[in-house]
Regions:
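A short, internal acetyl-CoA/4′-phosphopantetheine-binding micro-motif in the GNAT/acyltransferase core
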Residues: 79-82, 229, 279
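Active-site proximal loops enriched in glycine and acidic residues that flank catalytic Cys/His/Asp
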Residues: 211-212, 226, 255-260, 276, ...
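Acidic, metal-coordinating catalytic segment for phosphate/diphosphate chemistry
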Residues: 148-199
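Active-site-adjacent beta-strand/loop module that shapes the phosphate/pyrophosphate-binding cleft
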Residues: 260-283
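The catalytic Nudix box helix
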Residues: 223-258, 272
Length: 332
């Protein structure tokens, strides 16, 4: 899964500090993140302070510490939409002259190592672009993808909590913890994390999978049934309710599988397996799903990457307890 980045180590301990020259900086506007990209292979890497500052020095006054990976700090700069294209133009002006560290290229991932060797010798083969969360899904290596999408999640939270929901005053960063505090009434806002369940429903040797409607999600692949926990519910009650609402089925033997921080939707996903209880006729919730059906193990497609708990659950059903290992063998 996207958070499984070992041997790399993610540390979300709160600090107040300024970025060093080689620290990573995420510039974000409208949930789009500024990344460096190789022209030919489209390998995405994260800019560092020195190159951002060389082109747009005033941005560094807005830098906020986020977290570290392997003791390397990552920072956030919120960018107003009206400034986005100007910033991009200034960065592009200097891309052919700007030194880019070898370490930054090395971290781009094993798949693109050949392309990056050329990029080190010819910096003009690099460009900058505003990328979406969908682009981050394919980003290598995994620890950089995890860092990028976590930064987007924290940006969304900060953007939505600029003013106090109780009295309307402008919020300020806490000096002691990752929180936004109202200086007038003391209201404290923490990062948004919404609990949600995702359930693999089995019917003998078949698994229920669905597809979202185009207007409901950007994800076009096969998905498991999922939904947010409502007030006053246990996770197991949420499983039963969501399954009934989305596909009109009853389930039993609900068993916990794994959990996952899913920054793409500000959620903590709690994965369960459950067995069909009774009639297998699907009654589709058409405003959310475009289709749903029962699939044998042979009919379940292999996803390109195991970044989500839902995908891991599908591979667990398809290949057994060693699902991830067998999935990797099939990718070779």
């Amino acid at each position: 899964m996207i958070q499984d980045i070992a041997p790399h180590r993610y540390d979300n301990t709160y600090h107040i500090q300024k970025p060093g020259a080689q620290d990573y900086v995420f510039c974000i506007q409208k949930s789009r993140i500024l990344l460096r990209e190789t022209v030919e292979e489209h390998v995405l890497t994260i800019p560092r302070r020195e190159e951002i500052e060389a082109a747009v020095p005033e941005l560094m006054d807005r830098a906020v510490y986020l977290f570290s990976v392997d003791e390397k700090p990552y920072f956030l700069v919120s960018v107003p939409e009206k400034e986005a294209e100007e910033i991009l133009a200034k960065l592009k002006e200097g891309v052919g002259q700007m030194p880019v560290s070898d370490k930054n290229h090395m971290e781009a991932g094993k798949m693109a190592s050949g392309a990056l060797e050329g990029a080190e010798k010819e910096p003009e083969q690099l460009c900058y672009a505003w990328k979406t969360s969908t682009d981050i899904r394919a980003m290598e290596p995994m620890h950089q993808a995890f860092a990028a999408i976590t930064a987007v999640q924290l940006w969304r939270w900060r953007q939505s909590r600029q003013f106090c929901g109780r009295c309307g005053a402008k919020t300020q960063d806490s000096k002691n913890e990752r929180a936004l505090v109202c200086p007038v009434c003391g209201q404290t806002e923490y990062p948004k994390i919404s609990p949600a369940v995702i359930v693999a429903i089995t019917n003998g040797d078949k698994l229920l999978m669905s597809r979202y409607r185009v207007n409901h999600s950007t994800y076009r692949g096969y998905a498991l049934i999922a939904g947010f926990v409502e007030i006053g519910e246990t996770f197991e009650e949420t499983v039963r309710r969501e399954v009934m609402e989305e596909v009109g089925l009853k389930v039993k033997n609900i068993r916990y599988f794994k959990s996952q921080p899913w920054a793409f939707t500000d959620t903590e996903m709690i994965g369960f397996f459950a067995e069909l209880d009774g009639d297998d006729k699907i009654r589709l919730q058409e405003d959310e799903l475009s289709e749903a059906g029962w699939y044998t193990r042979e009919e379940i497609p292999d996803d390109a990457r195991l970044i989500s708990v839902g995908t891991e659950m599908k591979m667990y059903f398809k290949y057994g307890p060693d699902g991830e290992k067998k999935w990797q063998e099939h990718q070779k």
